[in-house]
């Protein structure tokens, strides 16, 4: 919204303090969340500009590849769009088809800039290269649109979501398939998953020892405390041992 500085301050002033901020956004949203982390919590991932990686082969529909690519590119000029294939012929046809389809796209300026700045075509030569490339990219969205998806599916460990087969376009997951769409970007799928209920729960450790329990393990803990020259720790443990 075109608010001036004073209006923005008024909006923030009237907002209640929160303990956690979650949700996707562009590069500015992701940057803002990073700056407030520590004062509040954020989800354990980077939910920044959108990404798609498409795995295609000689039997993949050219139209499906191109439309999935521009469907991601039109999100944001910072969107990342990657095609991975072994098929040189598909690459040649894809480049031409992409150019044609971009001409009629209402958001063609955004999509064109996205593809120019962040688009990539990876020509690979074997399945090992495919698997390694995907796991290294760790895309937010992965479309596996090949004739035999089973040989890849269980070897992909780093991806926010995986759309399998020709009838599972990424764009559908934006709206109607029911899976969570707040997903890790910027390769953060290597260490995190999509937003889930677990992000809204905290865990508290509860420790309860019996007299017998503290006597059994206290000796070991005391040795460690004394080794670290933490006399107070050792005294605290000893005060509970052999106490009548």
Briefly describe each language-model feature range.
Residues 135-244:
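C-terminal core of ALDH-fold dehydrogenases
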Residues 6, 15-19, 24, 40-42, ...:
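Short coil/turn connectors at secondary-structure junctions
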Residues 1-12:
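Single conserved hydrophobic/aromatic residue that forms the stacking wall/gate
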Residues 27-129:
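ALDH superfamily catalytic-core signature
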């Amino acid at each position: 919204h075109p608010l001036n500085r004073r209006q923005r301050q008024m909006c923030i002033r009237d907002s209640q303090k929160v303990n956690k901020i979650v949700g996707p956004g562009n590069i500015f949203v992701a940057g803002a969340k990073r700056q407030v982390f520590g004062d509040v919590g954020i989800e354990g991932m980077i939910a920044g500009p959108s990404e798609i990686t498409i795995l295609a082969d000689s039997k993949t529909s050219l139209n499906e590849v191109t439309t999935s690519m521009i469907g991601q590119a039109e999100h944001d000029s910072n969107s990342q769009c990657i095609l991975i294939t072994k098929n040189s012929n598909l690459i040649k046809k894809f480049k031409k088809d992409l150019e044609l389809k971009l001409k009629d796209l209402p958001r063609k300026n955004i999509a064109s800039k996205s593809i120019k700045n962040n688009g990539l075509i990876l020509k690979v030569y074997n399945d090992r290269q495919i698997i390694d490339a995907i796991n290294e990219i760790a895309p937010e969205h992965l479309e596996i649109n090949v004739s035999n998806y089973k040989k890849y599916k269980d070897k992909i460990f780093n991806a926010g979501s995986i759309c399998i087969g020709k009838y599972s376009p990424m764009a559908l997951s934006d709206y109607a398939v029911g899976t969570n769409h707040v997903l890790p970007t910027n390769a953060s799928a290597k260490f995190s998953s999509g937003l889930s209920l677990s992000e809204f729960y905290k865990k508290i450790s509860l420790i309860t020892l019996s007299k017998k329990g503290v006597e059994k393990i206290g000796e070991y803990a005391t040795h460690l405390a004394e080794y670290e020259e933490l006399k107070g720790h050792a005294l605290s443990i000893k005060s509970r041992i052999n106490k009548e």
